[in-house]
Amino acid sequence: PAGQAKNQRLPLPLARLEELLASSKAVVIGPGLGQSEAAVALVKETLSRCEVPLVVDADALNLIARRPSLLSCRKSNWIFTPHPGEMSRLTEHEIPEILCESRAIAAAYRDHYGVTVCLKTSESVIAVAESQKIYRNESGTPALAKAGSGDVLSGIIAGLLCLGMEPGAAAAYGAYLHGRAGQVAAGKFSLHGILARDIADAVPTVMRSAQTIELE
């Protein structure tokens, strides 16, 4: 992790950022980043220099919503993981509309920008870049609304990318694993008693039981 950006300068030397990117199989940017000018600089340099699959989440999505020019260097191996509030800022659609038309809105954003979109709702929609494929994930629980749960999803997707999955498959399978892990954790700790780390801790158990799933 590069650390939270607090100043107006890039929060780490550019050479160090390039070294981190070059040594990575996948990258996540956004969780815990903040929205300072230093965060803008980090997002800009990461987006322009990253060649490996990139998961864009949280504050990185909010910064892109404020500065769409950051997408000028977009690539098809990027995965955006917005919740409805972030999707509203990215698209200017109202949240109720996004909830009602999640499939169409995710697909439209995918088609316009050429990135995979994993729109996190009660039944998440994954619109795959460079494809007409759209997956709908039906696993999950209201417990996934916990703070930090979305960060867990980003980490799951990045882990699958590191295993060699294509971005669309990693996003779809990651959403399924995340939902099932939430169900397992909620069964153990109750809907109101779980924390994001409990969801993460349940992922290995879910993966062992889900290895035979195939995406069509």
Task: Label the predicted regions.
Residues 1-139, 208, 212-216:
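Glycine-rich phosphate/dinucleotide-binding loop and adjoining beta-alpha-beta core of small-molecule
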Residues 3, 7, 32-33, 147, ...:
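Hydrophobic alpha-helical scaffolding
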Residues 88-89, 143-177:
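Short, small-residue alpha-helix embedded
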Residues 90-91, 137-144, 154-158, 183-192:
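Short beta-alpha connecting loops at secondary-structure transitions
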Residues 95-102, 164-169, 190-194:
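Short, charged, surface-exposed loops that flank catalytic or proteolytic processing sites
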Residues 102-110, 167-181, 196-204:
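Short, well-structured alpha-helical segments that form the helix of a local strand-helix-strand
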Residues 182-216:
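Charged C-terminal helix
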